[in-house]
Amino acid sequence: NNEIGVFIGGSNYIGDVGPTTYINPFKYNGSRLKLLETIGTETTFYSLGLIYRKNFNSRISARFKINYANIGSDDKMPSSDLYRQERGKSFQNTILEYGLGIDFNFIDFDVLDSSIQMTPYINTGISLFSSNLLRYKKGISSAEKYGSFYNYSIPITIGYKIKPFQSFIIGFEITANATFTDNLDGNDPHENAIIAPLYDEAFGSTLSNDWYVFSGITLTYLFGNKK
């Protein structure tokens, strides 16, 4: 009744820089990001993770996960709002996430049954993540790193999984993570009085926090299959 496996997919962010597309993990114009090694190319923002799942019954299971992802955005992208394109900010950041949550299967999913099993599912819980503190030096459009911080997020996952073989489960899922910070993109830096004049002030909306989204596949191996 236990599973261990991996998550592989793309990532994107929703906040105060660049487009506001909710799910867009795969292609990004990184020509303006000084932090990228491949200047002028299309960049894929990825997410990789490890999963452990404990199945209590055919409907309910607990999940522990560790995910690493890179995120970024650019005001100059064509799908950005006009005022953002004129502002011209861009950034790149990383996220290291530890999460615990509950999966609910909409259809009975018996991991001990040798027949093919499949079901849509949802998941939610709580995650602790670390990320880089960013800020924008006056006259420079790309954000720079100046530290790190920890924060929490609430994941909301929808997915579909299938057990085509006795010991393996394949899943396809999208997880939107609502954070408790508005600073994944560096739009709300906290500067001391000495260096503050060298950097831009806060910008963007203060009415909502940033989100990050993971879209991809899971592959898990079943072990300890005893009722």
Where are these regions (language model features)?
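Residues on the lipid-exposed face of transmembrane beta-strands in outer-membrane beta-barrel proteins
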Residues: 6, 10, 50-54, 100-106, ...
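Repeated loop/turn-to-beta-strand initiation elements of outer-membrane beta-barrel proteins
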Residues: 14, 59-62, 110, 166-170, ...
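Extracellular loop and loop/strand-boundary signature of outer-membrane beta-barrel proteins
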Residues: 28-38, 83-91, 140-146, 202-205
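Residues that define the transmembrane beta-barrel architecture of outer-membrane proteins
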Residues: 42-46, 94-98, 116-118, 146-154, ...
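Gram-negative (and chloroplast) outer-membrane scaffold detector with strong preference
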Residues: 54, 58-137, 221-223
